[in-house]
Amino acid sequence: MRGLTLLSLAFLGVCSALTVPHSLVHPRDLEIRHGGIEGRITNGNLASEGQVPYIVGVSLNSNGNWWWCGGSIIGHTWVLTAAHCTAGADEASLYYGAVNYNEPAFRHTVSSENFIRYPHYVGLDHDLALIKTPHVDFYSLVNKIELPSLDDRYNSYENNWVQAAGWGAIYDGSNVVEDLRVVDLKVISVAECQAYYGTDTASENTICVETPDGKATCQGDSGGPLVTKEGDKLIGITSFVSAYGCQVGGPAGFTRVTKYLEWIKEETGIYY
C-alpha cells in the first residue's frame, strides 16, 4: 500500500518536502504562489458567463484567517461542498453567479451553525458537507445542479467524461482577480486510483479522474463540482490531489456523491 500524508493548512513547500511516493493532500492545503498557474484549474479553459450557473465560490473565515473553496447549488437553500473546506471555519461567504469571483451577481454570508458535515467525516473519507443558505431564486446565471437519481446510486461512471470547475487559489492578504475555469476529464476505475494512492485513501466512497497533460483540479478548487458531460449530474466533490503537485499526473480524487444520496435526502429533502 502506498504511503499517505495529510497536510495542515499552514504547510509550505509541499512539492519539495515530501519523500513518500504518491502521497496526497486536499487542494485547500497546497502552497499558494501568486502570479502562477497553480491557483486555478490547471490547463483548463476560461468559463463563459452562465456556463456553470450551479457553482458558488466559498470564502471561509476563522478568526481572520481566510481560505477559498468551491461549492455546488443543489437547491434553493442548499450548497454542497467538501467537509474539509468547512473544518475550523466560523463563517462562509457564498459568491453566486460569478465568472470573476470579485464580481458575483450577489453574495450571502452564513455562520458555521449552517454547516452540516457528514457525521462520519474523518481526514479524507466521507469528505462532504452541506451549507444551509438563504433562499436563492434561479435564473440564467444562478441555478441548481441535479444529483444522480437514487436508482443510479451504483453507477461507477468509469470511462465517463466529466467536467470540473473552479476559481483556484486562496489569497494571502490581497484581492487577486481570478476567473472561473473548467476542464474536461475522464473517470478511471477505483482500482486504478487505489494502485496509485492505496486502498485506505481511494475507497469505494471516492471517484477518481485521470489528469493528462497537466489538466487537473488544484488549490482553491476544493469542494467544487464534478459533473457528467452527458446529463449534467453532480457526481463528485473535489477532495484531494497528489501532494507532489497538481500537474504531476497523479489521479485527482472526488467524494462520490452517489454514496451519500440518502443522507442528502434526509438532511435536505432533495432527491431524484
UniProtKB/Swiss-Prot annotation:
SMART domains linked: Tryp_SPc
Xref: Gene3D superfamilies: Trypsin-like serine proteases (2.40.10.10)
Disulfide pattern: 69-85, 193-208, 218-246
CDD domains: Tryp_SPc
Keyword Signal: yes
GO molecular function terms listed in the Swiss-Prot or TrEMBL record: endopeptidase activity; serine hydrolase activity; serine-type endopeptidase activity
Example of a GO cellular component annotation carried by this entry: extracellular space
Tissue: Abundantly expressed in the larval gut.
Record-annotated active site: 84 (charge relay system), 127 (charge relay system), 222 (charge relay system)
Domain Peptidase S1: 41-269
Alphabetical GO biological process terms: innate immune response; proteolysis
Protein's UniProt keywords contain Heme: no
Keywords: Disulfide bond, Hydrolase, Protease, Serine protease, Signal, Zymogen
Propeptide position ranges: 18-40
EC numbers: 3.4.21.-
Its biological purpose: Its major function may be to aid in digestion.
Protein name per UniProt: Serine protease 3
Lineage: Eukaryota, Metazoa, Ecdysozoa, Arthropoda, Hexapoda
Gene: Jon99Ci
